[in-house]
């Protein structure tokens, strides 16, 4: 047996440098748990001059790292989609183990990688929710269960913004600026606030839970950029919080996948998850509900997950990457057939008969009201009507909102949030 496993590290940014630091600082406990010493032999970066003082070779020659016969595991922390995918294929072709934190690459290429890998280990614990061991939970801890559903706060940036809006009555714009100032949001935060990042993670988790090869364009994705303080006020009034959730549900003949802002009851454990923290609730048919909570991003939490994969590979606990021999054939539930309760916000003319018109359209679409708030806008002839419904289907709700928008008394496009009870 080898006395040391050599790592080839691609990328020395926030996570890459944290991997190097932890491997050095915790080398004894890592060796005890892995049963072998683990160290970085070589790292590849774009600009060698920016990375000084490391006790291993640093170059910009990626091919030499792949070809180095002394390197046992390649760890990819470079970002992007196609370049990391090409690196993964070349690494696996050399029968070297591959570890990645790259959720976008896995969202698009996870099944191709599993087919390429054959019996060569691939680790990707760090690709979803950083320091939370949700990948291992689905692959191993819950493997005796049918996963009935899971839902989670999968993006720390959006959760921080919504937490600020809920607790401090901040506008979306101000909460986003605050997140950027603190380093929680990128200068271009589109992937976070539009739900794309959470959707990438949802696809990876759905592959593990259900064995399906779903595509990004097939699932319902909505972001948080249309949420306003009025929505938060309604949520507080009726005992809800608003969170961006990734949701998966198993039906007898299909799988339901969606990412969108959701109103959830304050009794729900996920409603208590604030700031940049992540959490995922998983329901198995035998174990019941389990909850996984922790830091979803950041250098050291993500590096911790990367190193857990390296240790797993060192122990030679290789297994199927996605936990299924072959992709399962269950289709996705059509978006228009989704069933839940809804919240809507309307800007209307402040005049008699408007609410009667709204109620009539909802009734025509078999939608019944649950809670209603009406807010006058001072020094104007306008008002806001905020309401929630009982359970209905997506098609009926969208049809009703379209009809409401066509009313002369409705002054702007109606806004909608789904309720996840």
From Swiss-Prot:
Q: Which residues bind NADPH?
A: 15, 46, 103, 298
Note whether Metal-binding occurs among the keywords. yes
Residues bound to Na(+): 125, 128, 130, 132
GO biological-process terms attached to the record? methionine biosynthetic process; threonine biosynthetic process
UniProt-annotated binding residues for NADP(+): 15, 46, 103, 183, 186, 298
Annotated positions binding NAD(+): 15, 34, 44, 298
Q: Which Gene3D superfamilies does the record cross-reference, listed alphabetically?
A: 3.30.70.260, Dihydrodipicolinate Reductase, domain 2 (3.30.360.10), NAD(P)-binding Rossmann-like Domain (3.40.50.720)
Cofactor field: a metal cation
What is the reaction catalyzed? L-homoserine + NADP(+) = L-aspartate 4-semialdehyde + NADPH + H(+); L-homoserine + NAD(+) = L-aspartate 4-semialdehyde + NADH + H(+)
Q: Which domain of life is it from?
A: Bacteria
Sorted UniProt keywords: Amino-acid biosynthesis, Metal-binding, Methionine biosynthesis, NAD, NADP, Oxidoreductase, Sodium, Threonine biosynthesis
Q: Where is L-homoserine annotated to bind? A: 186, 197
Q: Any idea which GO molecular function terms this record carries?
A: homoserine dehydrogenase activity; metal ion binding; NAD+ binding; NADP binding
Q: Which Pfam families match?
A: ACT (PF01842), Homoserine_dh (PF00742), NAD_binding_3 (PF03447)
Cofactor: how and how many bound: A sodium ion is seen in the structure; a metal ion may subtly affect the relative position of the nucleotide-binding region to influence enzyme activity, and could increase the stability of the enzyme.
Residues of the active site are 201 (proton donor)
Ranges of residues in domain ACT: 343-418
Give the record's pathway.
Answer: Amino-acid biosynthesis; L-methionine biosynthesis via de novo pathway; L-homoserine from L-aspartate: step 3/3; Amino-acid biosynthesis; L-threonine biosynthesis; L-threonine from L-aspartate: step 3/5
UniProt keyword DNA-binding, yes or no: no
Its family? Belongs to the homoserine dehydrogenase family.
Matching NCBIfam families, A to Z?
Answer: PRK06349.1
Function, in words:
Catalyzes the conversion of L-aspartate-beta-semialdehyde (L-Asa) to L-homoserine (L-Hse), the third step in the biosynthesis of threonine and methionine from aspartate.
Q: What is this protein called?
A: Homoserine dehydrogenase
